[in-house]
């Protein structure tokens, strides 16, 4: 094990101390991630140490009890984002400001449209004279511009809809960008997809068959989890169920195993739904009058998936009336749910402590994007759009942020 030199000031004298690399790594691994990244610019030796698997394991172990940073972003992505709720003051990353503020806003030199995000990566669509896609880490300020897909210009109906990652040992090893020909999303048995892989640096075009008819695919509400993309088919009907989740495994080798159509768990249609992730699972939140039900998708392998009812709560015990509507779940704390109220404010409910917290208290709140988003959702709720499913994107960070994966050809 090599020794490394550390300068130490004592009694006005500059002393040079040599520390074993193993001891030095253990000391540095206790620091927040944002501080560790500064050491990479000291010299090649520091960079090599910090980027090693050995150091990464030390860091993950040292911060095993620390929560990670996250944000709930209002609505579907677009030209700009605004954080509804989040947490950034963790010892693991040590970020000085809210995580949502790192996502490039509207008004940069190029026009950036935010398409998707997952595991600390963000997919941007740059709309100028020449449309391009970029994937990067806003926190690390690393961006990779993707090569143009060869079918650009052939069909104006091809849109980027999703970003999915392959994570190993807490590190993003690869990502794939998925585009869809949206002319083929109404009452279809197959979909036309264009997929870019950071491993190969190339685009592929493929036609994938669905196990049953897709009635109406909501491509804008795309959720990424466990190497899979999830969309909504709010008009799907199976027995007495209304609505389904369309799950697509981007990394599956067998075409027959790539698509799953999973009906929603509750049998009634006259309630408010939201779908999100929490604790590494896909979660469906159903509100029927004053009853709130939380369903967790346990497996995808069966024909219709397997849901488990994890919570059933009477909202009157929290002082909520029937005007409250589900919005999202805490990304990691499965006992915390977020709801909107008639004043278009966001509240969180801790199902363990029975504590209700108001998250929007500013006097200028009515001028924010969050207020207008919740107002739109509330109008939809009051209009009794029974089949609608609300989706609030989450921007979360993995246990360790490595460099953005890129093909050797880029």
Swiss-Prot record:
Superkingdom per UniProt: Eukaryota
Gene3D superfamilies: 1.20.1280.50
Matches recorded under InterPro entries: At3g26010-like, At3g26010-like_b-prop, F-box-like_dom_sf, F-box_dom
Keywords tagged on the record: Kelch repeat, Repeat
Kelch repeat copies, ranges: 177-227, 274-327
Disulfide bridge positions per record: none
Domain F-box, residue spans: 13-58
SMART domains: FBOX
Pfam families assigned to the protein according to its UniProt record, in alphabetical order: b-prop_At3g26010-like (PF24750), F-box (PF00646)
Keyword Repeat carried by entry: yes
Protein's recorded name: Putative F-box/kelch-repeat protein At1g15680
Protein's organism: Arabidopsis thaliana
């Amino acid at each position: 094990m090599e020794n490394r030199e550390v300068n130490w000031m004592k009694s006005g004298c500059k002393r040079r101390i040599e520390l074993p690399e193993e001891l030095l790594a253990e000391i540095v691994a206790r620091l927040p991630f944002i501080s560790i990244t500064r050491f990479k610019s000291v010299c090649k030796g520091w960079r090599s140490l910090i980027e090693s698997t050995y150091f990464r394991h030390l860091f993950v172990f040292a911060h095993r009890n620390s929560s990670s940073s996250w944000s709930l972003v209002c609505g579907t992505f677009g030209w700009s984002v605004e954080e509804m709720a989040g947490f950034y003051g963790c010892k693991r990353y040590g970020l000085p400001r809210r995580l949502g503020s790192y996502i490039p806003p509207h008004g940069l030199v190029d026009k950036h449209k935010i398409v998707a995000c997952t595991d600390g990566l963000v997919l941007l669509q740059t709309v100028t004279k020449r449309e391009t896609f970029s994937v990067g880490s806003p926190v690390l300020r690393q961006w990779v511009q993707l090569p143009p897909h060869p079918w650009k210009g052939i069909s104006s109906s091809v849109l980027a809809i999703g970003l999915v990652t392959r994570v190993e040992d807490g590190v993003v090893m690869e990502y794939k960008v998925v585009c869809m020909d949206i002319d083929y999303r109404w009452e279809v048995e197959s979909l036309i997809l264009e997929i870019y892989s950071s491993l190969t640096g190339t685009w592929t075009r493929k036609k994938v068959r669905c196990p049953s008819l897709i009635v109406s695919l909501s491509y804008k509400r795309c959720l990424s989890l466990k190497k899979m993309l999830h969309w909504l088919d709010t008009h799907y009907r199976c027995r007495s169920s209304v609505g389904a989740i369309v799950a697509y495994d981007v990394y599956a080798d067998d075409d027959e195993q790539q698509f799953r159509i999973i009906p929603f768990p509750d049998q009634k249609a006259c309630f408010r739904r939201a779908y999100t992730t929490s604790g590494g699972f896909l979660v469906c939140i159903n509100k029927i009058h004053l009853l709130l039900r939380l369903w967790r998708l346990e497996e995808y392998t069966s024909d219709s998936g397997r849901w488990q009812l994890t919570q059933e709560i009477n909202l009157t015990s929290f002082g909520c009336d029937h005007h409250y509507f589900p919005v999202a779940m805490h990304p990691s704390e499965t006992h915390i749910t977020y709801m909107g109220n008639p004043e278009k404010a966001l509240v969180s409910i801790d199902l363990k402590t029975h504590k209700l917290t108001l998250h929007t208290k500013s006097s200028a709140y009515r001028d924010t994007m969050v207020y207008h988003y919740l107002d739109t959702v509330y109008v939809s709720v009051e209009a009794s759009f029974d089949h609608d499913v609300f989706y609030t994107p989450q921007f979360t960070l993995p246990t360790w942020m490595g460099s953005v994966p890129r093909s050797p050809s880029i």
